[in-house]
A protein has these predicted regions:
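N-terminal export leaders
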Residues: 6-10
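C-terminal motif of bacterial Sec signal peptides marking the signal peptidase cleavage site
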Residues: 19-20
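Noncatalytic scaffold domains of N-terminal-nucleophile
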Residues: 24-61, 65, 73-238, 242-244, ...
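Internal maturation/activation junctions in enzymes
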Residues: 30, 315-435
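Alpha-helical support elements that line or immediately flank enzyme active sites
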Residues: 66-67, 153-161, 237-244, 249, ...
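Active-site rim segments in enzyme catalytic domains, especially the processed small/beta chain
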Residues: 86-93, 99-103, 107-110, 262-265, ...
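Short, small/polar residue-rich loop motifs at catalytic or cofactor-binding pockets
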Residues: 276, 414-417, 481-483
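Extended C-terminal subregions enriched in glycine
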Residues: 426, 476-478, 512, 521-569
Length: 603
């Protein structure tokens, strides 16, 4: 039974008042990762046996190589992650962390490989001497921002559950590419050219820049023998190769001796453990949607957005999102959502992000009211706040299960990360969102790979007006994330329908929500759903992908009271849909984001 004291109510009321009188953070966040232009030639890829999709074609092919050898979906994901460490170093790698959603054909598993704060971290980590928060670049670049990497431990845990191939085999494509070299892509070249901190790191400069300091050109063959040796050790010794011994010692030394030093130690690395969490599964129409629980906020926020849309339909059938089909558009996508659909998804997003800012953090440290936040009764009350006009800035609600009140977290919203999905011959599936946080992470390079700057995903400010922020820095804590690897099932049959996810910082929630509605409600194939223009709200302006929306749609939204912000929304959505026809034949269709370099491949 839900109960709350008078004192707790007064504290919560104060927090709500704080939120009402503050707008979201005004600090300009880092620019999004550059896209690759918008590819207009993509169509859904089809397969009968298995499929893999990743943000880089070399990674996708590594995944398919494992599937062709009888590997499971997690085998494919491990091979793809290893290759991404090499070919997409700005986005993810073995020096970072990941969340993994896994379907083994019988049950759903959620693996948390999120980085943790070192034992020496304090809540004043990102405060200057005067008590004010650091500027983001001052916090990001260097050892200060490095959390204990977790991706290899999470992959190890998942592999023990459903791996079919030997661990060592999964690193063969990455070792081969590291030794023989790969061609620098246009996107990687652009990101190198745009990053002014690479030149400050001797290791990064030697690897990414020419002798005269210019970025290596697109098409340059880039070899990484140091990383090949690391992969060989990991293949032979398992993740212990990274968390013990000489590699761990060098990681700790590089972090602690950097001019912007951090506290990550060998003991932190030795002590890291991945965690198997209880998946967050909620019903949406005739589907069951499963995502990550805290410390990711992505699963909760997406469940809230979908639940709010469902509640709106129950309250007024004319607001059924399924009836708001996209319309033809002269944009590169060829389609755009209707103003009504953008309005409803943006308003639902505002409500979800208001709750996210107040309640979401590492549930091992903070009592996050997850059940209350996704409860149908609560979402019905939240849906009732949506009208024909935009609410502007939403206030957080008061779900059941609140134990402690916190101040809202108004940290800048980051843009980063990578995504892989796979479905294997047995119908097993994986969705993994993986990251080093900002582009090129902390810019600390160790033996050919980059370390994360995941500590900057904590709130820089530990308290506000006497109230503590839930997502403040604490030793051993995992920072809040928006990563949202998602699996979708048919509620009646229990069969897997889709695996989907995206990079993009806090905008991941917008990207995945859009894709789910497009695939489930609007019946678009995965490629069309991914290619659909991005939009939404993170409880600020209504965000529209630059150059993708008609003047008529923008005016219609303005007429509803929306403040619009046209911005680059460089998602990297990957999705695979699995269907069975009347004769029982299974088929797969996959899509990759036209805004990046990825592809879906299968047999």
């Amino acid at each position: 039974v839900f109960s709350i004291s008078r004192r707790q109510l007064s504290v919560i009321a104060a927090a709500l008042a704080l939120t009402a009188c503050h707008s979201p953070v005004n600090e300009q966040p880092p620019a999004p990762e550059l896209g690759s232009g918008y590819r207009t030639d993509l169509t859904a890829q089809h397969a009968e046996r298995h499929m893999a999709a990743a943000a880089n074609p070399l990674a996708a092919e590594a995944g398919r190589e494992m599937l062709r050898q009888g590997g499971s979906a997690i085998d494919a994901a491990i091979a793809m992650q290893a290759v991404l460490t090499l070919v997409e170093p700005q986005s993810s790698g073995i020096g970072g962390g990941a969340f993994i959603m896994l379907w083994d054909g019988k049950s759903v598993h959620a693996y948390d490989g999120r980085e943790t704060a070192p034992a020496g971290a304090t809540e004043r980590l990102f405060l200057k001497a005067d008590g004010k928060p650091m500027a983001f670049p001052d916090a990001q670049v260097g050892g200060r921002s490095v959390g204990t990497p977790g991706v290899l431990r999470a992959l190890e845990m998942a592999h023990k559950k459903t791996g079919q191939l030997q661990w060592a085999k999964l690193f063969e494509p990455a070792i081969r590419l590291s030794e023989n070299g790969f061609a620098i892509s246009a996107r990687l070249h652009s990101l190198i050219a745009a990053d002014r901190y690479i030149a400050q790191s001797p290791e990064m400069a030697a690897y990414f820049l020419n002798a005269d300091g210019t970025p290596k050109a697109t098409g340059t063959l880039l070899k990484n023998p140091a990383l090949a040796e690391v992969f060989k050790r990991i293949a032979k010794e398992g993740p212990d190769a990274l968390y013990h011994g000489s590699i761990a010692e060098e990681i700790a030394s590089k972090v602690q001796r950097h001019r912007n030093a951090g506290s990550l130690s060998v003991a932190d690395l030795k002590g890291y453990t991945a965690k198997e969490r209880t998946p967050l599964c909620t019903d949406y129409q005739q589907w069951k949607v499963c995502g990550m629980p805290p410390p990711s906020s992505g699963g909760v926020a997406i469940a809230q957005i979908l639940g709010t849309l469902q509640a709106l339909q129950a309250q007024d059938p004319s607001l059924a999102i399924a009836a708001m089909q996209p319309v033809k558009s002269p944009s590169p996508a060829g389609l755009e959502p209707t103003p009504e659909a953008v309005h409803l998804l943006a308003e639902a997003g505002r409500l979800a992000f208001a709750d996210r800012a107040l309640y979401m953090a590492d549930s091992d440290f903070i009592p996050v009211p997850v059940a209350g936040l996704v409860a149908p009764d609560y979402l019905a009350k939240r849906a009732a706040l949506i009208s024909e006009r935009s609410m502007g800035i939403a206030k957080p609600g008061t779900p059941e299960g609140i134990q402690v009140a916190y101040a809202p977290d108004r940290s800048p919203l980051r843009i980063s990360t990578s995504q892989v999905v796979a479905v294997d011959d047995q119908g097993g599936a994986v969705s993994m969102t993986t990251t080093v946080e900002a582009a090129f992470g902390s810019h600390v390079m160790v033996q050919g790979f980059l370390l994360n700057n995941q500590m900057t995903d904590f709130s820089f400010i530990p308290e506000e007006d006497g109230q503590r922020v839930a997502n403040r820095v604490e030793p051993g804590k995992r920072p809040r994330s928006a990563m949202a690897p998602t699996l979708v099932f048919d509620r009646k049959s229990g069969e897997l329908l889709a695996t989907v996810g995206s990079p993009g910082g806090s905008q991941i929630i917008e990207y995945v929500s859009k894709s789910l509605v497009a695939m489930l409600d609007w019946k678009l194939d995965p490629q069309a759903a991914i290619s659909l223009p991005n939009f939404g709200s993170r409880n600020g302006a209504t965000e529209l992908e630059t150059g993708m929306f008609s003047p008529a749609l923008k005016q219609a939204l303005k007429d509803k009271g929306h403040m619009l912000s046209e911005i680059d929304m460089t998602s990297g959505i990957q999705a695979i849909v699995r269907t069975r026809d009347a004769q029982g034949k299974v088929s797969l269709s996959g899509g990759a984001d036209p805004r990046r370099e990825g592809e879906a491949v299968g047999d």
